[in-house]
Amino acid sequence: MLEGGKTMRIGVIGTGQIAHDNVRALLKTGRVEIAALCNRTREKAEAFADEYSLQVPVYTDYREMLACERLDAALINTPHGQHCRQFLDCCEAGLSIMVEKPLATSSADGLRMLRAAREAGVRAAVCHTQRYLAPMMALRAFLSGEEGRALGRLRHVSDTINLNYFHDQRPAWFFDPAQAGGGLLMTHGAHQIDRMHFLIGQPTDTLYAHLELMTAYSGLDGGYQLMGRCGEVTYLAQCAGYYLPQESALELTFERGSIRFSWKDNGVDRVGVWLGDGGQAYASLPCPFDMENTYVYQFDAMLDALEGKKNDAPTLEQATEVLLVLEAIRQSSDSGMAARVGTIPVD
């Protein structure tokens, strides 16, 4: 709710695949009104409205929607390469903004967006959804308690994502470097870097990386291997997008134990969190959160951010730090040497 008990009116920019998860979750929060929809193809926006019983105006030009509708906020669900321009126009319109990850396809654009939001005095948050996976929520809850603190200092993180990425059900824009900004590194590297930064509590300062470029898809990578450092904590991350079972797992090594995390059932791993404390086996930790509500948890946090309440939603600064890491990964892979990660200038 906004001041005076007013419900936040949201204009949705883009009604593609991810918009379904996002709008379904926003409606489930009971905290917003979807006030308008925009898609370049009118029929797709109209079909989207019908699916969710939304009796709202439909536009094919988001700028017209911003000018004609009395909105409080915008939700940007478009291909990565379109985020920056749309975000800047929403800032100019004075709207709060929720934008899909990655924030942009370059740190230069991320910094433009950050400065524009500051200058316009608007609030914004980024959909780095994996912070709100049920096992991640359980992991965070455990680490904030007495047992979690007893593990001592975090020393190392290992993070693996594998999946069959290059299939014909994936929207075509993912295979256009101008729209997607890259391959696995942009789509899943953004997830990995954000969740590791979030758990470690500070951004990457130095890294060494290798990108696997795809001959069949010019300008796209099919995976990467990465070693990084966040202050005194180190990490290893790897991702492959070949014909593989899906895997998404983390292991956090502390001074007095470790924690394993997985959010995919694949015949080897299963969804959950496990504690290893020096014994011969891992013990499963309770997970009172629901995987089906991942996006609801995310949007509750993001709406708190837009309403000026205490929250843990991904910020523009954090999302820009992710972009700086992705660029350093490319630099390291190209040079064959370690790379320092850029920082956000202090204005």
Report each predicted region and the residues it spans.
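N-terminal Rossmann-like dinucleotide-binding module
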Residues: 2-52, 303
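C-terminal helix-rich "cap/oligomerization" subdomain common to oxidoreductases
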Residues: 1-4, 73-76, 301-347
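Active-site loop of classical SDR/Rossmann-like NAD(P)-dependent oxidoreductases
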Residues: 40, 286-300
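Beta-loop-alpha module in the N-terminal Rossmann-like domain of NAD(P)-dependent dehydrogenases
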Residues: 56-116
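Predominantly a Rossmann-like dinucleotide-binding segment in NAD(P)-dependent oxidoreductases
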Residues: 130-210, 214-216, 336
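Hydrophobic residues in well-ordered beta-strands that form the structural core
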Residues: 60, 99, 124-126, 261
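Contiguous beta-strand/loop segments that form the cofactor/metal-binding neighborhood of enzyme cores
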Residues: 187, 193-267, 296-310, 344-347
